Amino acid sequence: MTITAVSAIRKPVLAWPLAEPDWLIAAGAAMAMLVLVLFGPGFLDDGDTTWHLAAGQWMIQHVAVPHTDPFSFTFAGAPWQAHEWLSEVLMAAAFHLGGWTGVLVLFGLVLAGSAFLLTSRIGKSLTGISLLLAVVLALACAQPSLIARPHVLVLPLLIGWTAVLLNARASGRAPPFWAAGLMLLWANMHGSYVFGLLLLGVLGLEALIDAEPDQRLGVVRDWGAFAAATVLAAVVTPQGMAGLLFPFKLMSMTGLGNIAEWRASDFSKLGMFELSLLAVLFVCLSRGVKVPLLRLLLLLLLLHMSLQHARHVFVAAMVAALLLAPCVAQASGAVRVGARVNARPLTWLVAAVAALTLVGGRAAVATPRGDAPNTPQAALAHVPAWLRAKPVLNDYDFGGYLIFEGVRPFIDGRTDMYGDAFMARYAKIVSPDQAALDAAIRQYQIAWTILPPDSPVVAELDREPGWRRLYADKYAVVHVRQQDAPAIH
């Protein structure tokens, strides 16, 4: 059977009364993501979520994007690139409108839309069980990174941008100029936009290589014009040209190894990334899947990035699924040219009502926010207001929560601002290197500390005669200098 004949087969053997099965897979993926965010545990528990919210609140209050640090006491006034400013404003607006429930609804709708968009695009190539497995593997790989932070808000842009470029290659034309608007949003929301530029370069070069000799000048003209518009859009940010260099500066920092998400992927225990990788290898090897050379090199780069830094699995899973789907379909002899996942209006209505019901159910019940590993709520509540105003030595993961509560931290998740030297010094302080700890206490006039119970500094301060415990629970221990202790009752 020819590819044309196969692509003409649009309807399944068993007709569904309201929608194609593929549309139901897309809708099911969207609903699953919505439920996971709205009702699943831990989505709000990341230590950076709170400082992103605080940054957004600051920008709304001042109607400006900060260029210096307004939060910490160690780097107050130091240069800071708020490169995720638009995401932070959206997060703060959602929090203002609906509290923590508003934040969950924002991210839930974004992830639901992303899942539907991803499934719809893959559904142009795969169908049925193949489509379901591809989507499940991609979303399962991304699951550890699904937290309330800006990189999740740009997921629809990542998927949409990749889809636009692949559509352009399939149609033999340059991408439409309106797509540069996606880059404008992306560059103001998260630093991963540089990968979008890389993807454009790879597929643009592929278009040039694949073109007939007499058509290459036109390819250079059309793709070059779009690339110029895209780069121009990417520098329309508060940071301008410096914003293009920021992601590379961040990834070159040696201190990233101290942060869990920047460490190498862990294969000591079987996880979804390893399972997905093995599944993809099995399918590609068993079916003789052929991937165009430049796309193969791009996939290898994605794999390298994911092995080197666990946080890149999120991007790799989405892009790899979109790149490999047509290759797998062609190897299976089931190319669906121009296929779409669709549904009748009544089905859309039912899906919309279901989504609204889920959102309403979440809004009807207050979102619980109590103590968590990154939010020492009870511990901070026991610190008097006058003591909060004094310099504190805090755990790295507590910094965001302190900012959110109006306390100036010693350190927080803005690693790019603090730099390698300060990060290395902090690692010594909390190891603890006694000399480094004593020097920091003297230099910054540390009056209190808030650290996890298993921090070596906690045991050290317990032995120090000049310090005493103010409060302790399973999440945090607060120490106060003895000279301030008499004022606390």
Q: Model-predicted segments: where are they?
A:
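Transmembrane catalytic cores of multi-pass membrane glycosyltransferases
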Residues: 60, 65, 117, 191-289, ...
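Membrane-interface alpha helices of multi-pass inner-membrane proteins
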Residues: 36, 138-142, 176-191, 229-234, ...
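Short hydrophobic alpha-helices at membrane interfaces in multi-pass membrane enzymes
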Residues: 167-184, 220-225, 293-300
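Short periplasmic/luminal acceptor-recognition loop of GT-C membrane glycosyltransferases, typified by
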Residues: 384-423, 442, 446-454, 479
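Membrane-interface transmembrane helices that cradle and orient dolichyl/undecaprenyl
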Residues: 159-176, 281-287
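Short acidic/glycine- and proline-prone juxtamembrane loop motifs at membrane-interface regions
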Residues: 145-153
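Short hydrophobic/aromatic helix or loop-helix immediately within or flanking a transmembrane segment
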Residues: 74-101, 105
